[in-house]
């Protein structure tokens, strides 16, 4: 297991199984999963309370979409790293997600390697930012 406990992660997805899968993958690799939310409103509340380093944020959720939640989160936390999680591969969605100022995205269905590879790139940015180095 890697030593990633210095990186805190918030998981936001309306699907219980997806949240559980991401939690297991990340914790197995040593990441500190500090919270989980089921919708965009919960994402904003937990992000402002917990100040995670990384947020894994589903694009399509009831009430408030991931993209709308991201806009709200960015208003109060400009530096948080956000990885969007989506099952939608169409170019329009990917373009909208990328334009929203994210650090990357994970396409569903995903596997542990894809999740960990993507999160590791962002974790390196977090660590570099803490030490004042550019990535």
Question: Which role does the model predict for each range below?
Answer:
Residues 39-42, 65-68:
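Acidic catalytic/metal-coordinating carboxylates
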Residues 117, 124-135:
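CheY-like receiver
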Residues 50-56:
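Active-site beta3 strand of CheY-like receiver
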Residues 61:
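Receiver (REC) domain active-site loop signature in two-component systems and cognate sites
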Residues 16-35:
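Two-component/phosphorelay signaling modules centered on CheY-like receiver
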Residues 92, 110-120:
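C-terminal output helix
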Residues 68, 89-104:
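Alpha4 helix (beta4-alpha4-beta5 surface) of REC/receiver domains from two-component response regulators
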